[in-house]
């Protein structure tokens, strides 16, 4: 198994699909990486030489992925909460942020129903 950005990339999968195992790299970015490194999208990871894998590592390192990206996202949410803006308040209360209705629905975000005490 090749190791890129601290993640074991599956050997049996095509390069584009295997790169999506890294948090922060989707199909579009994986295709862009393959195009910029001149590695075939349909080539399997086990078929790549060590030099090609090193080129992939260097290309992936240009992007914010895995731990750095997770940290950046959590810091952005924390910043919104510290500002006290509407989105920050909605994050703090674990409610939907983007105008969805909450009288009904929103159960995933709000969690299981709490019984009314008498």
From Swiss-Prot:
GO terms for molecular function: rRNA binding; structural constituent of ribosome; tRNA binding. Keywords: Ribonucleoprotein, Ribosomal protein, RNA-binding, rRNA-binding, tRNA-binding. It comes from the Bacteria. GO terms for biological process: translation. Coiled coil: none annotated. Residues 94-118 are annotated as: Disordered. One of its GO terms (cellular component) is cytosol. Belongs to the universal ribosomal protein uS13 family. Part of the 30S ribosomal subunit. Forms a loose heterodimer with protein S19. Forms two bridges to the 50S subunit in the 70S ribosome. Located at the top of the head of the 30S subunit, it contacts several helices of the 16S rRNA. In the 70S ribosome it contacts the 23S rRNA (bridge B1a) and protein L5 of the 50S subunit (bridge B1b), connecting the 2 subunits; these bridges are implicated in subunit movement. Contacts the tRNAs in the A and P-sites. This is Small ribosomal subunit protein uS13. It comes from Shewanella denitrificans (strain OS217 / ATCC BAA-1090 / DSM 15013). The gene is rpsM.
